[in-house]
Protein backbone atom coordinates (compact mmCIF):
# COMPACT_ATOMS: atom_id res chain seq x y z
CA UNK A 1 0.00 0.00 0.00
CA UNK A 2 1.10 3.53 -0.77
CA UNK A 3 0.20 5.28 2.48
CA UNK A 4 2.08 8.46 3.34
CA UNK A 5 4.08 8.69 0.12
CA UNK A 6 4.06 12.34 -0.89
CA UNK A 7 5.00 13.60 -4.34
CA UNK A 8 4.69 12.24 -7.84
CA UNK A 9 7.18 9.86 -9.46
CA UNK A 10 6.54 11.25 -12.96
CA UNK A 11 7.80 7.95 -14.44
CA UNK A 12 11.42 8.85 -13.64
CA UNK A 13 14.15 7.62 -11.33
CA UNK A 14 14.91 9.64 -8.21
CA UNK A 15 18.12 11.08 -9.66
CA UNK A 16 16.36 12.03 -12.91
CA UNK A 17 13.57 13.76 -10.96
CA UNK A 18 16.08 15.66 -8.85
CA UNK A 19 18.02 16.83 -11.92
CA UNK A 20 14.84 17.71 -13.80
CA UNK A 21 13.50 19.81 -10.92
CA UNK A 22 16.86 21.57 -10.56
CA UNK A 23 16.86 22.43 -14.28
CA UNK A 24 13.22 23.52 -14.21
CA UNK A 25 13.82 25.72 -11.15
CA UNK A 26 16.83 27.33 -12.83
CA UNK A 27 14.81 27.99 -16.00
CA UNK A 28 11.93 29.43 -14.01
CA UNK A 29 14.20 31.77 -12.06
CA UNK A 30 16.04 32.83 -15.23
CA UNK A 31 13.02 33.42 -17.48
CA UNK A 32 10.43 34.00 -14.70
CA UNK A 33 7.91 31.96 -16.71
CA UNK A 34 7.94 28.41 -18.11
CA UNK A 35 5.46 26.16 -19.91
CA UNK A 36 5.37 22.55 -18.73
CA UNK A 37 2.91 19.76 -18.01
CA UNK A 38 0.45 20.28 -15.17
CA UNK A 39 1.83 17.54 -12.85
CA UNK A 40 5.39 18.89 -13.24
CA UNK A 41 4.10 22.40 -12.57
CA UNK A 42 2.41 21.28 -9.37
CA UNK A 43 5.62 19.57 -8.23
CA UNK A 44 7.99 22.46 -9.06
CA UNK A 45 5.94 25.11 -7.24
CA UNK A 46 6.89 24.19 -3.61
CA UNK A 47 10.54 23.69 -4.62
CA UNK A 48 10.88 27.19 -6.10
CA UNK A 49 8.84 28.82 -3.33
CA UNK A 50 11.24 27.36 -0.75
CA UNK A 51 14.17 28.66 -2.81
CA UNK A 52 12.67 32.17 -2.83
CA UNK A 53 12.27 31.97 0.95
CA UNK A 54 15.95 30.98 1.16
CA UNK A 55 16.76 34.01 -0.98
CA UNK A 56 14.83 36.25 1.38
CA UNK A 57 16.96 34.98 4.28
CA UNK A 58 19.97 36.14 2.32
CA UNK A 59 22.77 34.78 4.50
CA UNK A 60 25.70 32.67 3.33
CA UNK A 61 24.24 29.40 4.56
CA UNK A 62 21.00 30.03 2.65
CA UNK A 63 23.01 30.82 -0.49
CA UNK A 64 24.95 27.57 -0.16
CA UNK A 65 21.73 25.61 0.35
CA UNK A 66 20.31 27.15 -2.83
CA UNK A 67 23.48 26.36 -4.79
CA UNK A 68 23.28 22.74 -3.61
CA UNK A 69 19.81 22.48 -5.16
CA UNK A 70 20.16 24.56 -8.34
CA UNK A 71 23.91 24.16 -9.12
CA UNK A 72 24.14 27.38 -11.14
CA UNK A 73 25.79 30.35 -9.47
CA UNK A 74 24.39 32.93 -11.90
CA UNK A 75 20.83 31.75 -11.28
CA UNK A 76 21.37 31.78 -7.51
CA UNK A 77 22.72 35.32 -7.66
CA UNK A 78 19.61 36.43 -9.59
CA UNK A 79 17.45 34.65 -7.03
CA UNK A 80 19.12 36.39 -4.08
CA UNK A 81 19.63 39.82 -5.66
CA UNK A 82 16.55 40.38 -7.82
CA UNK A 83 13.75 37.99 -6.93
CA UNK A 84 14.23 37.92 -3.15
CA UNK A 85 14.16 41.71 -2.94
CA UNK A 86 11.03 41.83 -5.13
CA UNK A 87 9.14 39.56 -2.72
CA UNK A 88 10.59 40.93 0.54
CA UNK A 89 7.16 41.92 1.86
CA UNK A 90 5.20 38.92 0.54
CA UNK A 91 4.85 35.85 2.76
CA UNK A 92 4.65 32.92 0.36
CA UNK A 93 2.56 32.54 -2.76
CA UNK A 94 5.30 33.72 -5.11
CA UNK A 95 4.22 31.53 -8.06
CA UNK A 96 1.09 31.20 -10.16
CA UNK A 97 0.05 28.11 -12.13
CA UNK A 98 -2.32 28.71 -15.04
CA UNK A 99 -3.75 25.87 -17.08
CA UNK A 100 -2.78 26.19 -20.74
CA UNK A 101 -4.81 23.61 -22.62
CA UNK A 102 -3.53 20.31 -23.93
CA UNK A 103 -0.40 19.38 -25.88
CA UNK A 104 -0.94 18.46 -29.53
CA UNK A 105 1.07 15.23 -29.64
CA UNK A 106 -0.10 13.31 -26.58
CA UNK A 107 -2.97 15.44 -25.20
CA UNK A 108 -1.07 16.06 -21.95
CA UNK A 109 -2.45 18.84 -19.77
CA UNK A 110 -0.15 21.85 -20.02
CA UNK A 111 0.38 24.72 -17.58
CA UNK A 112 2.20 28.04 -17.40
CA UNK A 113 4.21 28.58 -14.21
CA UNK A 114 5.21 32.17 -13.52
CA UNK A 115 6.16 34.51 -10.72
CA UNK A 116 3.25 36.60 -9.48
CA UNK A 117 4.82 40.04 -10.03
CA UNK A 118 7.19 38.91 -12.75
CA UNK A 119 9.34 41.07 -15.00
CA UNK A 120 7.64 40.74 -18.38
CA UNK A 121 10.91 41.49 -20.19
CA UNK A 122 12.85 38.66 -18.49
CA UNK A 123 11.48 35.93 -20.77
CA UNK A 124 13.68 35.81 -23.86
CA UNK A 125 16.04 38.52 -22.63
CA UNK A 126 19.12 36.40 -23.33
CA UNK A 127 17.93 35.68 -26.87
CA UNK A 128 17.15 39.35 -27.49
CA UNK A 129 20.61 40.35 -26.24
CA UNK A 130 22.25 37.71 -28.48
CA UNK A 131 20.30 38.87 -31.55
CA UNK A 132 21.14 42.52 -30.83
CA UNK A 133 24.85 41.64 -30.49
CA UNK A 134 24.77 39.73 -33.79
CA UNK A 135 23.08 42.66 -35.54
CA UNK A 136 25.73 45.05 -34.21
CA UNK A 137 28.48 42.69 -35.38
CA UNK A 138 26.97 42.50 -38.86
CA UNK A 139 26.49 46.27 -39.04
CA UNK A 140 30.10 46.94 -38.01
From Swiss-Prot:
Q: Which InterPro entries match?
A: Ribosomal_bL17, Ribosomal_bL17_CS, Ribosomal_bL17_sf
Q: Does the keyword Ribosomal protein apply?
A: yes
Q: Which Gene3D superfamilies match?
A: Ribosomal protein L17 (3.90.1030.10)
Record GO cellular component, one term: cytosolic large ribosomal subunit
Q: Which UniProt keywords apply?
A: Ribonucleoprotein, Ribosomal protein
Superkingdom, natural source: Bacteria
Cite a single GO BP annotation.
translation
State the Gene Ontology terms under molecular function: structural constituent of ribosome
For this protein, the record's Pfam families field holds:
Ribosomal_L17 (PF01196)
Assembly, per entry: Part of the 50S ribosomal subunit. Contacts protein L32.
| Family stated for the protein in its record | Belongs to the bacterial ribosomal protein bL17 family.
According to UniProt, the name of this protein is Large ribosomal subunit protein bL17
Amino acid sequence: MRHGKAGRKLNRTASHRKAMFANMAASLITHEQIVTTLPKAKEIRPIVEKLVTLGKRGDLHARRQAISQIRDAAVVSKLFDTIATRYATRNGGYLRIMKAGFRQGDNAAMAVVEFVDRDTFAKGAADKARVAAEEQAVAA
